[in-house]
Amino acid sequence: MTLTQLNAFVLVARLGSVTAAANALGVSESAVSQALSALRLHLGDQLVTRGPVGMKLTPGGSRLLPTASQIVVLGAEAHAAVRAAQGAPEQLRVVSTSTIAEFMVSPLTEAFSKRFPGSVEVSAGVAVTKEMSVLVANRLADVAISSAIPEDPGMALATEPIFKYRLVVVTAGQPRLRGGPRQWLWFVDPSGTDPGSETGQLLTSLGIPEEQVRVFPNQTAAWAAAADGTGVAPAVEHLVAQRLRRGELSRVDAPGCKLDACWHVTLLERQHQSVAASSFRRYLGTPEAMHLMRSPAGGVPPSRFRPPVYVTIWS
C-alpha cells in the first residue's frame, strides 16, 4: 500500500470518476486505474464500485476514506516540510474556473509575486467548481477562486466572498437575433460546461438546450463569435465594457439575461493554511487586487494553464 495508491483512491471517491481523478493529478486514466487496482488487491476489497450516478463506496471503502485522506494530507505536508528545509520557495498553487484564469489569475499572481521576489513559486490550474474543494482539501491546490463552493464540514475549508460582479449576455453591435433565448446560439468558454459556474447557472435558469451551445477555447473567442452576429455570449459586465463602448458588442436586454454574482476564494481553515496561501488571501483584499479584478490589463488563454500536479507522489 503506497501514498500513490491512497491518493488515487481518495480522488476517485471524492470526484466520482477515474477520469476526474486523472485530470486532477495530471496523469493518465490507466495510471489511476492501476493504482486503484493495486490497492484493491492489497486490501482484498473493491473499495469503490461504479453506480448509476458515479462511483459508490463499499463499506470497506467508506471506512478507509477518512484515514486515507489523513495520510494523503500528511504526505503533502511532509513534502512541503522537506522543500522548506532545502530552502526551496514556498509553493502557491491557484486553481480557478476558465474565465477567471483567462482574465484574472495571471495579473493577480504576477503582482503578488513581486511582493515576495524569489520566496514564492506560483502555479495555476483550471478546474470545474465541484472539483475545487477536493483539490484544496487534498493539498493539490492552495487557493481556489470561483463561484461559491458548497460547504462540506468534513473537508475543513473556509470560503469567503471577494468580488461582486454582474454577468450579462452580449451579441453583435447591430443585433440580428430572432426568437427567444432557447432559440439563440450560445457561445461560451469552457466554464459554460460547468454546472456550478455562474455561466452554467445562467444557461440552466434559461433552459438553454445543449444543442444550442457552442464551446470555445476561451471567453475572448466566444465574444468574437457573438460579434459576428450569429448568436450570443455570456460576459462579465466590467470585462466586456470596452467592447460595448466601441460598439463591437451590445447587451441583450431580455428577461433572465443578467445575473448578479460574486467570486469567492476557498482555502484550508486558517490553522492549516500555508504562509503563501494566507498571504495571498490577504492580498486579494487590497486596493491593488481590487483594481486588477475590476480592470485587468490583459488575459491569458486557459491553454496556458494546467491542473496542479504533485509529481512526487507518482515517482
Task: Go through each PLM region and give its residues.
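A late-sequence structural motif
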Residues: 177, 253-308, 314
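Alpha-helical linker/hinge and terminal dimerization helices associated
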Residues: 42-43, 64-86
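Acidic, Gly/Pro-rich loop/turn segments at junctions of secondary structure
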Residues: 127-184, 239, 313-314
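Short helix-boundary/capping micro-motifs
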Residues: 10-28
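Central regulatory/effector-binding core of bacterial HTH transcription factors
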Residues: 89-152
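A short LG(V/I)-centered, amphipathic sequence patch enriched
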Residues: 40-59
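Secondary-structure junction motif
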Residues: 182-209, 274, 290-298
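Hydrophobic hinge/microswitch elements
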Residues: 127-132, 140, 147, 207-252, ...
